[in-house]
A protein has these predicted regions:
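Active-site catalytic microenvironments for nucleophilic, acid-base chemistry
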Residues: 12, 59-63, 157-161
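Short clusters of hydrophobic/aromatic residues that line enzyme substrate/ligand-binding pockets
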Residues: 31, 69-71, 139-140
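Short, structured active-site "lid" loops
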Residues: 15, 31-60
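A short beta-strand-loop structural module common to alpha/beta enzyme folds
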Residues: 13-26
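Helix-adjacent hinge/juxtasegments
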Residues: 57-78, 84-86
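GST-like fold's C-terminal all-alpha helical module
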Residues: 85-180
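Single conserved hydrophobic/aromatic residue that forms the stacking wall/gate
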Residues: 1-7, 11
Length: 191
């Protein structure tokens, strides 16, 4: 999960530290010095280090104030923006994380097909409100926003994991729109 998938829209001076998405690399002493739980992402900006996805996006938005990716609190779209900004980490990422653990990180003998199937169903169910919200819209609140930075990559991953069903036409279009963004294409090519 990587907010950097969309941060190229705001944060031009980024340097990407690539690493293998493997427990031995994530749990290495070197990486744990950056993130105490051995997870990703991590943002270093001078002497500042942040390792929570939403906090990274909010920090970059406030610190670098480029673009119009966050509506003002007085804007009618602000409550909806806030909803979708936080929906990613609260509702969509937990089942994605379970799917990744069950299919990539755990040794085969420790994987549980029931847990995997339950996570897939939960993910599809969690995406239904997003699909409904996208009716008649290109992006979550109309124009591209930081809510799309947070949720767009999760929807892209959900689609790749086979959890965006064929009836979710709005979601399919949304994933295509996210995938067409130059910053997203650059970030995907680096991963």
């Amino acid at each position: 999960r990587s907010p950097s998938r969309g941060l190229g829209d705001v944060y031009k001076r980024q340097e990407v530290n690539r690493m293998d998405f493997h427990p031995k690399d994530l749990k290495s002493d070197e990486h744990r010095s950056r993130h105490p739980l051995g997870r990703i992402p991590v943002l270093d900006d001078g002497d500042i280090r942040i390792y929570e996805s939403g906090a990274i996006v909010e920090y970059v938005l406030e610190r670098h104030k480029k673009g119009n990716l966050k509506p003002d609190v007085s804007n009618d779209n602000y409550p909806e923006y806030l909803q979708w900004f936080h929906y990613c980490e609260g509702m969509v990422m937990p089942p994605i994380n379970t799917i990744i653990v069950q299919t990539l990180l755990l040794p085969e003998e420790r994987r549980d097909e029931n847990v995997l199937n339950q996570a897939r169903k939960l993910l599809s169910k969690s995406l239904e409100p997003v699909n409904q919200a996208l009716e008649g819209r290109e992006y979550l609140i109309g124009n591209f926003s930081a809510a799309d930075i947070m949720l767009g990559h999760a929807c892209f991953m959900s689609n790749r994991l086979g959890c965006v069903n064929e009836e979710m036409l709005n979601m399919k279009s949304y994933v295509e729109n996210i995938n067409k963004r130059p910053a997203f294409q650059i970030a995907i090519s680096m991963s």
